[in-house]
Amino acid sequence: VPHRLPQDEFGRMVEAVNALLQALKEAKERERAFLAEASHELRTPLTVLLGHLDRLGRNPQDLEALRTARATAERMRRLVEDLLALARGEVERNLNLHIVDLGEVAREAALEHGVAAEAESGEVLGDPDRLLQLLRNLVANAVRAAGKEGVRVRVRREADHALLEVEDSGPGIPEDLLPRLFQRFARGPGGGTGLGLAIAHAIAKAHGGEIAVESRPGRTVFRVRLPLLEEEA
């Protein structure tokens, strides 16, 4: 909206509208990039899955093809779950609360991805499935950035909180991306759909916790703090 007005109330209003239009344009561009990436993320494993299923059709005893097909199907299932969780707003609602040892959850996620873990026990009140989803998203993001050997998962007790850290030795996150890293469709240098970190942020908030990131070339650390149960504090 072009204007040549003095800095009065109307002029400031026009500037605010322009800022809003720019924000909407950027959001639309992120959405288009996400749709393209999500289509690619689904199409690629589908091609792999169909290929291995074809191999199984010719040789039902091919266990390697079966393992790969199962792993690929699981990857697709998680992506679809992420999409549905955000679309329905389910991340913040309908938590199935239990006493959860965050250290156990961290070790499970680390084992799934083949990365190192140093996890103390720390009991929190939370949804075990959502907390595992949070861990999986952070660890998968780190593995994309640095490979399995460059990732460390840690859990320790810190005053009245459990502190979870996922560290990688990848190239780091561009400084201009950091302020919007946990927004939907914000994609880091490692690629991906831009959903994982937004979901991790929503899960942490839903559990009364917080998530933050510190990054420089060669070292990125995501930190999640969750309230410990009173008897653990």
Task: Go through each PLM region and give its residues.
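HAMP signal relay modules and closely related sensory coiled-coil linkers
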Residues: R4-A19
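Membrane-proximal coiled-coil signaling linkers
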Residues: L24-R75
